[in-house]
Amino acid sequence: MTESVLDYMTRLGRAAREASRVIGRASTAQKNRALQATAAALDEARAELSAANALDLANGQANGLEPAMLERLALTPARIDGMIVGLRQVAALADPVGAIRDMSYRPSGIQVGKMRVPLGVVGIIYESRPNVTIDAASLCLKSGNATILRGGSEAIHSNRAIAACIERGLAEAGLPAAVVQVVETTDRAAVGALISMPEYVDVIVPRGGKGLIERVSRDARVPVIKHLDGICHVYVSAHADLPKAQKIAFNAKTYRYGICGAMETLLVDQTIAADFLPSMAAQFREKGVELRGCERTRELIDVIPATEDDWHTEYLDAILSIRVVSGLDEAIEHINHYGSHHSDAIVSDHQSQVRRFMAEVDSSSVMVNAPTCFADGFEYGLGAEIGISTDKLHARGPVGLEGLTCEKYIVIGDGQLRGQA
């Protein structure tokens, strides 16, 4: 009798829960051995990885995948190199598990503090990019978590080949294969099952398009670490160094159009707009960026009229909305109303203005005189990241190793009894 998708996912979940107890108590040295051995296995399996990826690319072309999707799907030699380097970098990171802080004596004589521990089992749902399999597996492993990885059906052969390398690495370190499990079925019902197993899965991390993340957020029966959009702003204030502001705004938009930290709306103070916008617009046009602007912007430069929808849109493309604002108050109001609480920046040399912006903009990252594209775990010194969270509970901003752990209280006594002196 063929195993149903629900039975299959339940089997994975049960195995992951058992494996989480093993990896949760594994030493840092053992976890690092698994990471280094996986890196070596990837290096030895380059031909197998390339062959599996060629199957996915051929199927993708036959199924009419867009060129951008095919590009993300490709496992080039450079990307294989990147996966190997990434594993070694995670191995070199400090292990957060077991760290104890804030120990203090209470009047009763007991000591109270906090210990950092793994979350348990992390389910990760992602699309297209097979290198995410390694990113996610390495972070979960190092942070002492078991993980169930459900990649996109378009990358199934690549993910299976990568999973074989991970299994070799785990075996060499004496860890069970169920520490990292890749979902083998392409049936979409697997996603529904994975997000509905609170008895086996402690948290879900969706990485992909807005539709996927909305579905997971709506239907999940376990906590979700996620962000929906990256509608990021740069506000150029009246107190900005304009040449510096132009460089920051240009980098924020053009570093990479498709990342969630790319600037989508440029806010410019009305007092400097006439001096700033013409040359700024010329730089964007030379780069091929389509500009859309409010009425006041259009009085200064020739741009497409911006609609209400533009302020709500994450373009992930060479398109930029521009709005002239009356000052700091309107800039903050615009960001908090239209933004996605991801990453927003101010360019200003006025310290009290900067402090207000940092305090009042309700985003997971706030930049001062720096572009929003710095919103990245590596740039923040976290090493790799599992994703970026715009929620306020548990992790917020780029989620690295520490974000895949939590704290529990530890209480140490010497026979003290409550209510007795």
From Swiss-Prot:
One of its GO terms (molecular function) is NADP binding. It comes from the Bacteria. It is found in: Cytoplasm. The keyword Oxidoreductase applies. It holds the Pfam family Aldedh. Keywords: Amino-acid biosynthesis, Cytoplasm, NADP, Oxidoreductase, Proline biosynthesis. GO terms for cellular component: cytoplasm. Transmembrane segments: none annotated. It is an enzyme of class 1 (oxidoreductase). Its EC number is 1.2.1.41. It catalyses: L-glutamate 5-semialdehyde + phosphate + NADP(+) = L-glutamyl 5-phosphate + NADPH + H(+). InterPro entries: Ald_DH/histidinol_DH (IPR016161), Ald_DH_C (IPR016163), Ald_DH_N (IPR016162), Aldehyde_DH_dom (IPR015590), G-glutamylP_reductase_CS (IPR020593), Glu-5-SA_DH (IPR012134), GPR_dom (IPR000965). Pathway: Amino-acid biosynthesis; L-proline biosynthesis; L-glutamate 5-semialdehyde from L-glutamate: step 2/2. GO terms for biological process: L-proline biosynthetic process. Catalyzes the NADPH-dependent reduction of L-glutamate 5-phosphate into L-glutamate 5-semialdehyde and phosphate. The product spontaneously undergoes cyclization to form 1-pyrroline-5-carboxylate. Belongs to the gamma-glutamyl phosphate reductase family. PANTHER family: DELTA-1-PYRROLINE-5-CARBOXYLATE SYNTHASE, GLUTAMATE SEMIALDEHYDE DEHYDROGENASE. This is Gamma-glutamyl phosphate reductase. It comes from Pseudomonas syringae pv. syringae (strain B728a).
